[in-house]
Amino acid sequence: MQASTKLTLAIALAAGLTAQGALAQEQTVTVMAYSGLFQERYTKAVIEPFMKANPGIKVEYFPLPNSAQMLGNLRAQKAAPQADVVIMDVSVSKAATDEKLLIKIDDKVSKNVADLYPNARIADVDGVAVTFDNLVMLYNSDVVKEAPKSWMDLAKPDLKGKVAIPGMPDIQGLSLVLIMNKARGGADYLKSVDQGIAALGEIAPNVQTWEPKPEVYPVIISGQAVAGAGWNARAQVNADASGGKLKAVLPQEGSVFQINTINYVANGPGKDAGAKFIDYALSPEAQKSFTESMFYAPTNAKAQISDAAIARTAVKSMDKVIPVDWIALAKVREPIMEQWRRKVIPLSR
């Protein structure tokens, strides 16, 4: 064999081994999280920058519409998990924690845990908060000319049949019950939400739908309904997309925080690459990027958010945010749901 041929074969062999080594080293992280707008914005703001900074790690996004379905997937895959990281509501994260489906996220998993706001670390939950959102009142500014000031404006006669609220078991309906319960003098929502249920009973005759589809924002933008309730983050993005037709306000009675947690799946296939993604997702850089992209309030206290973005979150209105222990509330959620079925739904028919 000629020397040149030997050299060519040697180079080819070395190249092949190098390629095999690169393939062997590449890791995949599967992130299970919300579909739709969340997926679109989170991919651009967090996942793509993470992959750029970590060229040896590929992130695959597995979208699902809600946290309950995510928990169902985790349960079904317990023996052989397919996901490494899950972003879901805190109450569902608690259920996954109790079922030992998760690894606790502490400073050993991510150094950024130390910089999270105190309410981002939830007792007896393995995940930590990755976003804060809050309930807002929505309205179609082409029809409703004056910005509403109270949640009870939804009960005004001129809105008969024009209100859309994602009702219970959706957490948005439950949140509105809690807000109005406090506004009307209810002391402990874990003992009674009678005042909140009564308030929703007054709004109910105006409600066109408790199940706006595909979600509440386009229903109000289209004029099918003209007022309602929804989450601030999606409301802000839809307000921009509608050219300002959809508007969102924080009524005088206040709001509550909804907490999305990021969770580390036990025995996930991506191993330590999952922890690396979680660390990045909790970093000031990622928190800033997603807040400025979709207007979720950040959970990392060191995130330097622009004034324009912060103004579109509840961060500057914390005095209006009612504290809720979602974990304790989960224990009384079914009795509240039963009151909703008996005392609210019939009044909207």
Name these PLM-found stretches.
Residues 92-95, 221, 226-245:
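A ligand-binding cleft/hinge motif common to bilobed small-molecule-binding domains
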Residues 103-111, 126-127, 155, 244-256, ...:
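Short beta-strand->loop
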Residues 133, 197-203, 242-266, 301-302:
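Periplasmic-binding protein-like
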Residues 137-143, 181-183, 258-271, 289-292:
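A bilobed periplasmic-binding-protein/Venus flytrap-type ligand-binding module shared by bacterial periplasmic
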Residues 33-43, 67, 82-83, 87-224:
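Extracytoplasmic ligand-binding site segments that recognize negatively charged/polar headgroups
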Residues 320-349:
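Conserved C-terminal helix/tail region of periplasmic/extracytoplasmic solute-binding proteins
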Residues 265-324:
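Mature extracytoplasmic/periplasmic domains
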Residues 25-92:
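Early extracytoplasmic/lumenal segment of secretory-pathway proteins
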